[in-house]
């Protein structure tokens, strides 16, 4: 996305926007151009940013107030440049591919234990029985498409993402943060598992570098594309508490990490990485997803009910 002072999209533009790990069609209602002191609506009228509910994090960037097609107005929200995409054939195809990763999980029956509901209002998923390892079939690629990658995710993990979406958007729960097993712990556990397999020092250096890159991706993208609207108030509260010391990888856990892997192919497509580096990243991504599948019961987090005040503010 462009960093120019002029806004990339204008009011009333048809766009695509990330909401959580998926992409939805949306319409731009209002815009805020980088470093400007006003917000512009579809009629060209200006409103001071102080009265436009523009989050302070968007004061210094191009930002867009969008309405998701077919959604109620309560879901309208401000999004930054990293969450908005031009409505074109390539991006619509990316939207479909992301959606298919979740809808395929719904086609197959879930084998799940009854979710346990604690007296405190917490809710935790039961895990499906692990399936045998599946060989990923390579898709035919179009040579004209740049950095097209596919990261295989087992049905067990897709079930987690489907439940995750339902708990947050349907039941209006949030994940209990901080996680007892945050992303940084998961990545370190994976590194230790590779060391225990007597992996060579040279290979370990490569794996360690990739894990550092994944953690950096996670920290940079969490607030931009990995949160549902209902979770943003929780994030803002954490930001107030931790300030510049906030590192999402030390607070958020496996559910948000899985959302990153769903979005990762799209992120890779926007980089200038060479094909060798991409192949190494994809291979390690598949390996760590396999590791997460085998250890999911250790990493799952509780969902908790929110207060009426939180519910009201988060939906406003």
From Swiss-Prot:
Protein purpose: Involved in deacetylation of histones, chromatin assembly and chromosome segregation. May act as a transcriptional oscillator, directing histone deacetylases to specific chromosomal domains. Component of the NuA4 histone acetyltransferase complex which is involved in transcriptional activation of selected genes principally by acetylation of nucleosomal histone H4 and H2A. The NuA4 complex is also involved in DNA repair.
Protein's name according to its UniProt entry: Chromatin modification-related protein EAF3
Chief site of localization: nucleus
One Pfam assignment: MSL3_chromo-like
InterPro entries documented for this protein: Chromo-like_dom_sf, MRG, MRG_C_sf, MRG_dom, MSL3_chromo-like
Location(s) in or outside the cell: Nucleus
Organism: Debaryomyces hansenii (strain ATCC 36239 / CBS 767 / BCRC 21394 / JCM 1990 / NBRC 0083 / IGC 2968) (Yeast)
Domain Tudor-knot intervals: 13-84
One GO location term (cellular component): Rpd3S complex
One GO process term, biological-process aspect: transcription elongation by RNA polymerase II
Residues that span the membrane, as ranges: none
Superkingdom of origin organism: Eukaryota
PANTHER family: MORTALITY FACTOR 4-LIKE PROTEIN, MSL COMPLEX SUBUNIT 3
Keywords: Chromatin regulator, DNA damage, DNA repair, Nucleus, Transcription, Transcription regulation
Subunit structure of this chain's protein: Component of the NuA4 histone acetyltransferase complex.
Family (UniProt): Belongs to the MRG family.
Gene3D superfamilies for the chain: 2.30.30.140, MRG domain (1.10.274.30)
GO molecular function: histone reader activity; methylated histone binding
MRG domain boundaries: 145-316
SUPFAM superfamilies assigned to the protein according to its UniProt record, in alphabetical order: Chromo domain-like
Region (Disordered): 114-140
